[in-house]
C-alpha cells in the first residue's frame, strides 16, 4: 500500500493521526467487525470558517503589527558560502545528508536547556543561528521554522494542513555568550508563538519585500525539530514502521531537521544541489556538532571563541596546509613564468578588479604592447621605470610590460602627495613614468 498525499491537505501531525486511526481500525476489520471511529467535534471546513472570522479587525492588526515590528529591516538574504553561483531563478534540485549526534551530547543539550529554562528547540535553534552567523559573517540571522498550528483541542484529531511557518530572528553578536543568545532566542520564540496565527504569506505581504526569483522571501534556511515522529505500530499481525526515502528536491537553500532516536538526536540536512556540494554540507554538519560540544561545555563563553574546527581540521589548517615549500625555476624571470602560464591557459582568468578583468592571454598581449612601446622610448635592460598606478588590471599590465622590456619598475603609490611623488621620481632617475590617464599631473 502506497499512500501519497499533497501537502495542501495534510501535514506531519496528520500522518500520525492517520496511523493511529489505522491501528485502531485494522484489527477490528481483520476480526470481521465493523470498524468505526468516534465522531469528530468539528471538520476542517469548520476550522477554516472560524479562522477567517477570528483573524480580522483588531486581532488581525495586532498580529500584523507584531511581525512588521519584529522583522523591520531584516536582511532579505543569508549569504552562505556556496560552491556555485546562485542561479537567476531558484531551482528545486536537492539531496539529503543524515548525521547522528552522540547520545551523550544529546543528553548534555537537554540538560543545558533545562538549566537555562529553555526548550530543546530553543537551544538547538540558538546554536544553529550561531553557526549560520559564523558561516555567513552576518549578525542579523532570520531562520524559518514550522509550527503545528493546533492550538485548539478540537483540531488535534483532524487531518488537514494546519502548519504555519514562523520567521525567527536573532542578533548574533560574536561578543555574546551562548547563554545570552539563548535568552534572546527564547524571548523571540515566545513572542512568535503568541502571534503564530497570521499565515506566513500574509507576513511577507505585510513587509512588502522586493521580489527576487533567485531565492525564497525573508529566509532561505529552515530549521525543524520533530517532536512527533511517525511511530512503529503493531496491529492485526502487521508491523508498520517509517521508511526513510532519499529526496531529490529542496524547498530552501538549506533545511536542517532534528529528531529524537534511541541513540540521540539525528540531524537530516536537506540542501539545494545547485548551490552546495555534499562535502560542503557534511563539513557544516560536523561544525554544528563541534559547536554544540563547545557551547554545552562552556555556555558562558563568547560565541566567537567557540571553535568550529575538530582537532583533525585544526591540524590540517595549522600544519598540513602550512607546508607551502615548493621547488620552482630559480633562474627563470617571473615574466617568463607568466608567459608559460599564459601559453598553458590563455583563456583562464588572470586578474579581476572592480573595473574589469582579463584572461592570461589578454594580459600577456597587453603587456607585450607596453614592452614594445617602452623599448621605442629607449628603455634598456636594468633601466628604471616609475610605475604609479591604482590597484587595477592596468597595474598588472604595467609591471609585466616593464619586466618584458628589460627594465626594473619603481612602484610609487598615487595616494602620496604630489610633491613627494615628484621627488621620489626624480631620485629614481627613471627614464619613463608609466601611469594612468586620470592620475596625470
What residue ranges belong to the model's regions?
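Generic detection of short hydrophobic beta-strand segments and adjacent strand-loop junctions
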Residues: 78-80, 97-101, 170
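Carrier-protein-dependent adenylate-forming modules in NRPS/ANL systems
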Residues: 1-43, 64, 69, 80-82, ...
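N-terminal beta-alpha "docking/capping" segments at the starts of catalytic domains
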Residues: 8-9, 41-45, 69-70, 79-91, ...
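Short beta-strand micro-motifs enriched in acidic
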Residues: 257-261
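Short, contiguous pre-domain boundary segments
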Residues: 45-50, 319-322
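His-Asp-centered acyl/peptidyl-transfer active-site segments
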Residues: 50-65, 88, 95, 111-125, ...
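RNase H-like polynucleotidyl transferase catalytic core
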Residues: 73, 80, 143-150, 411-412
Amino acid at each position: 500500500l502506497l499512500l501519497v498525499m499533497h501537502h495542501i491537505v495534510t501535514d506531519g501531525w496528520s500522518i500520525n493521526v492517520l496511523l493511529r486511526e489505522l491501528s485502531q481500525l485494522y484489527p477490528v476489520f481483520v476480526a470481521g467487525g465493523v470498524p468505526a471511529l468516534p465522531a469528530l467535534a468539528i471538520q476542517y471546513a469548520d476550522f477554516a470558517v472560524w479562522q477567517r472570522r477570528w483573524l480580522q479587525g483588531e486581532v488581525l492588526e495586532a498580529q500584523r503589527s507584531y511581525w512588521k515590528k519584529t522583522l523591520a529591516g531584516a536582511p532579505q538574504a543569508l549569504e552562505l558560502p556556496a560552491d556555485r553561483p546562485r542561479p537567476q531563478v531558484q531551482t528545486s534540485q536537492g539531496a539529503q545528508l543524515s548525521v547522528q549526534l552522540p547520545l551523550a551530547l544529546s543528553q548534555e543539550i537537554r540538560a543545558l536547556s533545562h538549566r537555562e529554562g529553555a526548550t530543546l528547540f530553543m537551544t538547538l535553534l540558538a546554536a544553529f543561528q550561531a553557526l549560520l552567523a559564523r558561516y555567513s559573517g552576518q549578525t542579523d540571522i532570520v531562520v524559518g521554522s514550522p509550527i503545528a498550528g493546533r492550538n485548539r483541542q478540537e483540531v488535534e484529531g483532524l487531518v488537514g494542513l494546519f502548519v504555519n511557518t514562523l520567521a525567527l530572528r536573532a542578533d548574533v553578536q560574536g561578543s555574546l555568550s551562548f547563554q545570552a543568545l539563548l535568552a534572546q532566542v527564547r524571548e523571540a520564540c515566545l513572542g512568535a508563538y503568541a502571534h503564530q496565527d497570521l499565515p506566513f504569506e500574509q507576513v511577507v505581504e505585510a513587509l512588502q519585500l522586493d521580489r527576487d526569483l533567485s531565492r525564497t522571501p525573508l529566509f532561505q534556511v529552515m530549521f525543524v525539530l520533530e517532536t512527533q515522529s511517525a511511530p512503529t505500530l503493531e496491529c492485526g499481525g502487521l508491523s508498520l514502521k517509517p521508511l526513510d526515502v532519499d529526496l531529490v528536491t529542496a524547498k530552501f537553500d538549506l533545511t536542517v531537521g532534528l529528531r529524537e532516536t534511541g541513540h540521540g538526536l539525528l540531524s537530516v540536512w536537506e540542501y539545494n544541489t545547485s548551490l552546495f556540494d555534499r562535502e560542503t554540507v557534511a563539513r557544516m554538519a560536523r561544525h554544528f556538532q563541534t559547536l554544540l560540544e563547545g557551547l554545552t561545555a562552556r555556555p558562558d563563553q563568547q560565541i566567537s571563541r567557540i571553535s568550529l574546527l575538530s582537532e583533525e581540521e585544526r591540524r590540517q589548517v595549522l600544519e598540513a596546509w602550512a607546508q607551502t615549500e615548493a621547488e620552482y625555476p630559480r633562474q627563470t624571470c617571473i615574466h617568463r613564468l607568466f608567459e608559460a602560464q599564459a601559453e598553458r591557459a590563455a583563456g583562464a582568468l588572470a586578474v579581476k578588479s572592480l573595473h574589469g578583468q582579463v584572461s592570461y592571454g589578454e594580459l600577456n598581449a597587453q603587456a607585450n604592447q607596453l614592452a614594445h612601446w617602452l623599448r621605442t622610448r629607449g628603455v634598456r635592460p636594468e633601466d628604471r621605470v616609475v610605475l604609479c598606478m591604482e590597484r587595477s588590471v592596468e597595474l598588472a599590465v604595467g609591471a609585466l610590460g616593464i619586466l618584458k622590456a628589460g627594465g626594473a619598475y619603481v612602484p610609487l603609490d598615487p595616494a602620496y602627495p604630489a610633491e613627494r611623488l615628484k621627488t621620489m621620481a626624480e631620485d629614481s632617475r627613471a627614464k619613463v613614468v608609466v601611469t594612468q590617464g586620470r592620475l596625470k599631473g
